[in-house]
């Protein structure tokens, strides 16, 4: 995530010339670098055999890029809701839209690659694992935002609230399921369970 945040910022700046995204992505990347330095144990996870696959790297990379873009869209949404009391400009909403388009596209690629990986590992493309369920809810939420923007382009604040709700769903999809009791021992995506299972196997 520390690598893909500034990369997302550079790509966004190169495409739409939003200068602020460079500073935002760099600062947020430094936050994650500090986490990696001072809490290295969070990465000390042993993957179960099914997850030790060539699909692991591209699947995670695509998702991290998607999360970086959608995170940037969320920061912009928060800024517009809290600091733009006199009206939101069309080009400001266009920024949120463009970031969401790219983020959702990469999220879709992540879901598709995950489905292919699941088929190879477990024999099915989709099993409504808790992680998959939250991923589907997140995907549909961002899709609903896009359709809402197309249908009601002037309803800026309602759209931005929807963007914040979508990001909350994304947080549950990303790491929130690790703490859901219903996911423990059930979800192959639950890192806490995966790590414990690997320890028991050793």
What are these model-predicted stretches?
Residues 1-44, 60-83, 92-120, 130-188:
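Hydrophobic cores of alpha-helical transmembrane segments in multi-pass integral membrane proteins
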Residues 46, 50-53, 87-91:
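Juxtamembrane loop-helix boundary motifs flanking transmembrane segments in multi-pass membrane proteins
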Residues 49-56, 122-133:
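Non-cytosolic membrane-interface motifs at loop->transmembrane helix junctions
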Residues 193-202:
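Single conserved hydrophobic/aromatic residue that forms the stacking wall/gate
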